[in-house]
Curated annotation (Swiss-Prot):
Taxonomy of the source species: Bacteria, Pseudomonadati, Pseudomonadota, Gammaproteobacteria, Alteromonadales
Membrane-spanning intervals of the chain: none
Protein family membership: Belongs to the bacterial ribosomal protein bS21 family.
This protein's encoding gene: rpsU
Protein name: Small ribosomal subunit protein bS21
InterPro entries linked to this entry: Ribosomal_bS21 (IPR001911), Ribosomal_bS21_CS (IPR018278), Ribosomal_bS21_sf (IPR038380)
GO molecular function, one term: structural constituent of ribosome
UniProt-listed GO biological process terms: translation
Species, as recorded: Colwellia psychrerythraea (strain 34H / ATCC BAA-681) (Vibrio psychroerythus)
Length: 71
């Protein structure tokens, strides 16, 4: 759990913004959304594999675009 110390004469809005930023960096909200409903292990593996395939295709696409620009 992210903890921030409110500084002397610090407005509430600024402290809240710092807290939100620290929560985002810690990945709390994404973790809560992920655990909101149960995901079967097979679905999780399928989702992760699809993401890996997408990343690989994106990487190849970038490499091809880089080669085209060199000539």
């Amino acid at each position: 759990m992210p903890v921030i110390k409110v500084r002397e004469n610090e407005p509430f809005d600024v402290a809240l913004r710092r807290f939100k930023r620290s929560c985002e960096k810690a990945g709390i909200l994404s973790e809560v959304r992920r655990r909101e409903s149960y995901e079967k292990p097979t679905w999780e593996r399928k989702r992760k594999k699809a993401a890996a395939v997408k990343r690989a295709a994106k990487k190849v696409s970038r490499e091809n675009a880089r080669r085209v620009r060199m000539y």
